[in-house]
């Protein structure tokens, strides 16, 4: 009571209540902050778990796609190996058949040479086919390695995208460990299933091809010696060998599986029904065997080309599946795929060129003996049965010699005297009528020849030209009437003066007309003509 003695009765001590209120406020604020912190932690944990779940879901999808691609690539590789082994075995069987057939045809050297050429071309084709298979193997993508000691597992493509989220990993390490364990278990189970499928396919392949491995190794050596491996291909082969799990070595007891499990991808050979076979009817048996060999070689070429086409189709389908996951694959895989496609196209073109060349050679070989067969001379039937062939040849030679001598004598200038004529001998006796007719004919010929000589010797008379006759006429007319008409006559004379070269008959007629006119004028008028100059001669004198 002493403490509160100084306090008045009506007053209340508020300090006590204030302290209690402050304590309650502090408790409430602390509880609120604790709740907020718990909510923040829960939200962060939920976000972290969601991110981890999403990341591991993406990783699981990516791993599943890669595992599927790898299994498909391994299956393709095994299928290609089976086709290689099948082709090599088939080639060996055909070689054995050819060797057995060649023993029957050893007497024909040309056929032996053609068979050696065919076997060498077959070996080249088989090497080229194995080379194309080796080059065309698809390269599987690299499987990411899982390290047991690391809790945080991320691929190379995800590290670049998750650099800004490292603080989330540190917070969510404990809840994500369980999820990672589950994912690792799933991955191990999927890898075991893929490895079991691989081991089953390997076992079936090895069970069916145990006897052919030696041949495939020899063909592989041939291909490796022909095609030098680049450092990129070596790295890829190392990755392939490291990517295969060790579980394939465990199941070796299943090698007794039948060969029917391996799919047979070899195409059916179409029957060669060509019009060239109709030419084989009239050929000897040796040529028939040779043509059969050539047809077998052409079939082998077609089968190899079709097998390569089927392999290219399988690889294209695998590439289409791989294209869906190209966002995760690096650019180097795209470049490798382009290189593989180019190499496949080149191999296909080479095989087609070889096929065309072989077809051309086969056609030439078929046409060659036929030409020789038709070039043989046919037997000419005898036309002259009275003489033997030797006598006929001698007669022909003698005739040719005589003909040459006669032609040589005919070409000489004095050949008429040398060649005997029948007209030189005594003529046959004729009847009297024929003799009289011959004498009359000879007399007529003599008279004609004398007349011809006389006509040739006659010279033309002077003053018989037309111009001279006209001048003479006008001169005479001027003597008779010296009137103005004379001028007109002179003008006409000047007009006619250039016309010369008339015939003798026309000049003669003009001369006669002038003569008659002159005589008429002389008798009628009685004029006396003056004497002419001595150098002028008239036509009628």
UniProtKB/Swiss-Prot annotation:
Residues 152-161 have a biased composition (Acidic residues). Pfam families: Hmw_CFAP97 (PF13879). InterPro entries: Cfap97/Hemingway (IPR038791), Hmw/CFAP97 (IPR029488). Highly expressed in testis with lower levels detected in other tissues including lung, heart and kidney. Residues 28-47, 93-296, 313-337, 406-430, 495-514 are annotated as: Disordered. Residues 382-459 form a coiled coil. It comes from the Eukaryota. The modification Phosphoserine is found at residues 8, 19, 160-161, 230, 258. Residues 35-47, 93-107, 142-151, 207-218, 287-296 have a biased composition (Basic and acidic residues). The keyword Glycoprotein does not apply. Residues 219-232, 240-250, 267-277, 503-513 have a biased composition (Polar residues). Belongs to the CFAP97 family. Residues 176-201 have a biased composition (Low complexity). The modification Phosphothreonine is found at residue 155. This is Cilia- and flagella-associated protein 97.
């Amino acid at each position: 009571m002493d403490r509160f003695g100084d306090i008045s009765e009506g007053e209340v001590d508020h300090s006590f209540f204030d302290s209690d209120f402050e304590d309650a406020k502090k408790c409430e604020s602390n509880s609120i902050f604790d709740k907020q912190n718990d909510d923040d932690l829960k939200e962060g944990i939920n976000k972290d778990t969601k991110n981890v779940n999403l990341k591991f879901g993406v990783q699981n999808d990516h791993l599943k796609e890669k595992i599927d691609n790898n299994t498909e690539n391994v299956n393709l590789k095994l299928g290609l190996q089976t086709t290689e082994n099948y082709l090599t075995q088939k080639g060996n069987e055909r070689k054995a058949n050819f060797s057995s057939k060649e023993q029957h045809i050893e007497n024909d050297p040309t056929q032996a040479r053609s068979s050696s050429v065919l076997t060498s071309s077959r070996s080249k084709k088989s090497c080229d086919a194995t080379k194309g298979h080796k080059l065309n193997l698809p390269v599987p993508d690299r499987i990411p390695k899982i390290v047991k000691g690391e809790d945080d597992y991320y691929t190379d493509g995800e590290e670049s995208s998750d650099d800004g989220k490292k603080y989330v990993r540190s917070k969510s390490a404990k809840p994500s460990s369980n999820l990672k364990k589950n994912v690792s278990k799933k991955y191990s189970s999927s890898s075991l299933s893929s490895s079991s499928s691989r081991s089953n396919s390997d076992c079936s392949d090895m069970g069916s091809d145990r006897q052919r491995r030696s041949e495939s190794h020899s063909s592989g050596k041939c291909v490796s010696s022909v095609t030098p491996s680049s450092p990129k291909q070596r790295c890829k082969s190392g990755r392939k060998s490291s990517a295969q799990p060790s579980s394939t070595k465990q199941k070796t007891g299943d090698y007794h599986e039948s060969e029917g499990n391996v799919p047979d991808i070899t195409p059916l050979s179409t029957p060669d029904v060509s019009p060239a076979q109709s030419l084989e009817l009239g050929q000897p048996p040796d040529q028939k065997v040779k043509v059969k060999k050539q047809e077998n070689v052409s079939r082998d070429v077609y089968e190899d080309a079709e097998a390569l086409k089927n392999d290219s189709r399988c690889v294209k389908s695998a590439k289409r599946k791989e294209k869906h996951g190209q966002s995760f694959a690096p650019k180097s895989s795209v470049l490798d795929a382009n290189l593989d496609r180019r190499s496949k196209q080149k191999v296909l073109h080479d095989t087609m060129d070889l096929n065309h060349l072989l077809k051309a050679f086969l056609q030439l070989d078929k046409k060659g003996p036929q030409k020789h067969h038709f070039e043989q001379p046919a037997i000419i039937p005898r036309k002259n049965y009275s003489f033997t062939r030797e006598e006929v040849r001698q007669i022909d030679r003698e005739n040719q010699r005589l003909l040459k001598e006669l032609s040589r004598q005919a070409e000489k200038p004095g050949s008429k005297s040398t060649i005997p004529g029948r007209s030189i001998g005594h003529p046959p006796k004729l009847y009297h009528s024929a003799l009289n007719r011959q004498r009359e004919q000879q007399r007529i010929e003599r008279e004609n020849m004398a007349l011809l000589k006389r006509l040739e010797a006659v010279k033309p008379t002077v003053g018989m030209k037309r111009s001279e006759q006209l001048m003479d006429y006008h001169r005479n007319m001027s003597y008779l009437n010296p009137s103005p008409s004379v001028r007109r006559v002179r003008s006409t004379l000047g007009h006619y003066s250039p016309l010369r070269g008339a015939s003798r008959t026309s000049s003669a007629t003009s001369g006669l007309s002038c003569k008659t006119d002159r005589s008429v004028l002389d008798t009628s008028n009685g004029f006396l003509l003056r004497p002419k100059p001595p150098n002028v001669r008239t036509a009628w004198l």
